[in-house]
Amino acid sequence: MVKSVLASALFAVSALAASRTTAPSGAIVVAKSGGDYTTIGDAIDALSTSTTDTQTIFIEEGTYDEQVYLPAMTGKVIIYGQTENTDSYADNLVTITHAISYEDAGESDDLTATFRNKAVGSQVYNLNIANTCGQACHQALALSAWADQQGYYGCNFTGYQDTLLAQTGNQLYINSYIEGAVDFIFGQHARAWFQNVDIRVVEGPTSASITANGRSSETDTSYYVINKSTVAAKEGDDVAEGTYYLGRPWSEYARVVFQQTSMTNVINSLGWTEWSTSTPNTEYVTFGEYANTGAGSEGTRASFAEKLDAKLTITDILGSDYTSWVDTSYF
């Protein structure tokens, strides 16, 4: 069964800063008690891959233990999670959880992900997405984002190592939460803009990095910008001062900027670190900061990092046409 809704974008705009407890007209409904389907995977399987119409899924309150795959589609797909406040992740009522290790997934990062998204132009609202495999599993993703013009609004991503893979295309993360320990915002080719995101580090490592950008050449357009966000320890966790770095270069042309972001003293005074002693990958990196605040923004930074004279803009990263696919009601 396929249901289309052409007014979904209008629904998203009108729902901002309000509750979303009922499905918009025409949406496929997922509910633990029934709905159209009881699993998210079955609802996605019911979508048409060939229609150019917008297709919408609404997920009712509950915890769904499944691995979700949204394949490439011809038209836009919008997924809404039930929430008491569309403007934030704090009141989300839908959690998707799964636990699979890198080894059990055939040594594929992507195949460990709780939510694998390869749909261009997809919009995801108010979902908690967790990989609960933990420290023993090493790489274990919550999200694997592999397509252009993807937007995540009021979402909560939790894991330990490699929580969020922003791999290809232009991507937006806004009013969201990202938690992890090791390289937990990573990828190779995406241009990703993170705004008003609460980044939380967990206890456990003696030294670790938040980002690991894998841009490997001058011609690769990959860029991660964390804008107007916060960096701190996960609530209740005891993280020693200076344990974490803002990033390390997965490849030698890595590009990451933190700007206008508040940082607690969990961030090391060097700010940034090498990939490893034997493979530093620092000669061509762009590791920048602008107008950050808090104890974690202080100190003498690594020699390969820089203080920027001006902030980057969203058009610098996502292009001048970003308003054609981004839900601008969140700005």
Swiss-Prot record:
Top-level lineage group: Eukaryota
Site, as annotated: Transition state stabilizer: 161
Active site: 162 (proton donor), 183 (nucleophile)
Cysteines engaged in disulfide bonds, as pairs: none
Signal peptide: 1-17
Record SUPFAM superfamilies: Pectin lyase-like
Record-level GO BP terms: cell wall modification; pectin catabolic process
Enzyme Commission number, as recorded: 3.1.1.11
GO cellular component entries: extracellular region
Subcellular location: Secreted
Entry binding sites for substrate: 139, 248, 250
Pathway in which this enzyme or protein is active: Glycan metabolism; pectin degradation; 2-dehydro-3-deoxy-D-gluconate from pectin: step 1/5
Catalytic activity: [(1->4)-alpha-D-galacturonosyl methyl ester](n) + n H2O = [(1->4)-alpha-D-galacturonosyl](n) + n methanol + n H(+)
An annotated Gene Ontology molecular function: pectinesterase activity
Name of the top EC class for this enzyme: hydrolase
Record Pfam families: Pectinesterase
Function summary: Involved in maceration and soft-rotting of plant tissue.
UniProt record similarity statement: Belongs to the pectinesterase family.
Descriptive protein name: Pectinesterase
